Amino acid sequence: MKNKLHHTLTRAVLLGLLASTAAAPAYAASSLSKPGQDIEGTLPGAEAGVENNMKKNTATNEVKFLVKNIQLDVEDEIKFNNAEIRDILLARIGKETTLAGLNDLQDQITAYCRSHGYPAAAAYLPAQESKDGNVILKVIPGRYGDVKLDNKSRFKDAAAKGFLAGLKKGEIIRTKDLETALYTISDFSGARAVGTLSAGKSFGTSDVTVHIEDGKPSSSIVYAENYGGESTGRYRYGAQHSIYNVDGMGSKVNVGALISNKSLHNYYVNYEALVGHGGTSLGIGYSRMDYEVSGPLKRLGAHGTADTISVYGSRPIYHTTDEKLALTYGYDYRRLKDDMDAFGAQADSKKHSHDIHAGVEGFWRDRKNGLLLNYNFVLTAGNVTADSTYARQLAKSGGTDGGFTKAEAKVTAVQSLGKQADVMVKLSGQAASKHLDSSEQMYIGGANAVRAYPQGAGTGDKGMLGTVEFRYYTDVPGLVASTYFDAGRSSIDNSTTTLKGWGVGLAYNAPDWFARVDYARRIGLGRALYDSISKDRGRFWFLAGKIW
């Protein structure tokens, strides 16, 4: 009888926990994000560029004549803004000039074309007699002559030539195609790739010599931050080691670890390789996270693990100095286990999930107006299956079992405000087809969200996050001061949480180390998911790391 009563009470307590546990985040859900994401952007990026060694026109004839009209003869393949070209020509029409002045006009038109997608274009004066003041100016786009390789790196010639195979002799030299090839070489090899243009053997052609010089064969980073959750350890310490161009064909290996000051451990390894010659990559990764809950809930004996196997890849559509677009895709398998020892095997939650995802990512830069736009869009379809009795009870109560779809979007815009300031606007959001398992939810509180609230606060199936941040670049190189406003809104079923806050930050970036500190205060109080929120109006965040 006593044993029966014990099981009855235990079952009642567990059922009482269902409502709160199904709606609340898993204790370590905020640590299930992409490993190493807090240090993204701190490692060196691709290095590529185009140099033009073709000579400018020169003339010493100072005989003046009146220019009444300029006829621009452009090959059909060249596309540019007619209004901008017209403004350049109108500055010369109706005025006296010399042959040197016309050569200067040629250089202006040439520079315009080269900065607008045709790096080998050239304007020139064909043989003509201009007795009536009418001048004919021709523009040729520049076509590939010989494409040569000067490889002084560990990246194998065969791999490099594969990227250059699309630069065919006789075709128009376009910035987008040439820089995409150069940046893709740099992305995979870790080397610096520069294309040098020189005069070709025949009129209207340019030879291209691609120089590849070795970069760092590997990089390492160690860092410390306090971006963790309260129950599993706010202070965390991480390390990551990346090896580039492992086999001379562009493959890459990343190994990393993250541990907290309490009882969270996260380890990951991935391998990425080049597939074909178009820059398509395919990788495989494995990560394992384990945790134990501390604090007021420690008496429950809550602990768990998450094992994730990922297959992922990308395909560049184009990549230049000022714009990039790439397709991304992947598959994830997760096995999740969450136990509460205080209730025995009845509180063991075991589940697994599969998902496939595809999206686009890239950036666009408007140098003239000082604007930079980064974007990332992902669509995910998956299935979550409960593997234990307690997990099935949770899934039934919350409606999280079975198939789901979700869409995620992130957009960041940076507008320059003179030489020492800019304003950054960040927007992100998630939409879902149903109530999601906690491993698939978003959260709106934390170091990379509304910074006035703890990590993982405001979890939801769908929601939006926004930040407006003013940044001032001080006279100390690399030191940036900022002030910002964060806001987020998330919802689960009919329950909605809104969080707002403001703060100040100080960041320092050098070639081999980085640091950032933030102090944020909440505005009002969102639906209190944690008692500590109502007690603490301000929060302090830091991140610091060293790169080798």
Report residues per predicted region.
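Transmembrane beta-strands of outer-membrane beta-barrel pores
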Residues: 226-228, 245, 257-261, 286-292, ...
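Repeated loop/turn-to-beta-strand initiation elements of outer-membrane beta-barrel proteins
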Residues: 193, 218-220, 247-253, 277-283, ...
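C-terminal transmembrane beta-barrel domains of outer membrane proteins
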Residues: 393-548
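Transmembrane beta-strand segments that form the barrel wall of outer-membrane beta-barrel proteins
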Residues: 197, 218-228, 239-240, 250-261, ...
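Periplasmic polypeptide-binding modules associated with outer-membrane biogenesis and secretion
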Residues: 27-228, 240, 257-265, 407, ...
